[in-house]
């Protein structure tokens, strides 16, 4: 299937996302690396600031570079504030110019009148773009709940963006919402803080 897609569709890069474990990521990379195409990968982090299997942003940065990925970062999770903590920590462990990837959910899903609705507005996702770029991301997008209207606002924000230094916790929370305790620890550079409660997330 990949050979057909490459031949017919002109595939430029292979993309793995919503991973939880390094073993899972490595197995996926091993399965596709013989196609000879560049590989990007993202993992999904919860309110503990780690993946479901306990992988920290620093772990991801180290192993992704060892695997030879051309880009890596975070997707899905529990919303922009927590994902920005992940991106900030990944950026501490890579060199300038590394393709750090940021793909946040469009807010938190809520069940309303019989359907799932994501709470993120166009304005929130535009602010998220500015914060992600200032946090070190080179590739910025949206994950669950992101519509074409959000993408339009995000594209405009990217076109107008001016780099302004790594945002503080106050900057992030004032613009896109509160960060969980576990993600605050990661944001502060402490990836060993014990976290007892993790919020469910997912949307592959």
How does the language model describe each region?
Residues 1-204:
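Domain-level signal for soluble alpha/beta catalytic cores
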């Amino acid at each position: 299937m990949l050979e057909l897609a490459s031949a017919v569709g002109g595939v430029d890069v292979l993309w793995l996302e919503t991973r939880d474990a390094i073993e899972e990521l490595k197995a996926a990379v091993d399965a596709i690396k013989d196609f000879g195409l560049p590989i990007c990968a993202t993992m999904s982090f919860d309110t503990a600031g780690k993946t479901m299997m306990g992988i920290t942003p620093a772990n991801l940065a180290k192993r992704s570079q060892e695997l030879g990925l051309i880009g890596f970062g975070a997707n899905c999770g529990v919303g922009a504030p927590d994902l920005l903590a992940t991106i900030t920590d990944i950026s501490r462990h890579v060199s300038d110019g590394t393709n750090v990837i940021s793909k946040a959910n469009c807010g938190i899903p809520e069940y309303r009148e019989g359907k799932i609705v994501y709470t993120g507005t166009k304005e929130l996702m535009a602010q998220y773009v500015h914060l992600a770029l200032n946090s070190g991301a080179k590739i910025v997008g949206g994950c669950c709940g992101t519509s074409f209207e959000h993408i339009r606002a995000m594209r405009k924000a990217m076109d107008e963006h001016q780099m302004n230094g790594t945002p503080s916790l106050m900057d992030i929370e004032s613009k896109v919402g509160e960060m969980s305790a576990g993600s605050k620890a990661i944001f502060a550079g402490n990836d060993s803080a014990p976290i007892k409660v993790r919020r469910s997330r997912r949307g592959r």
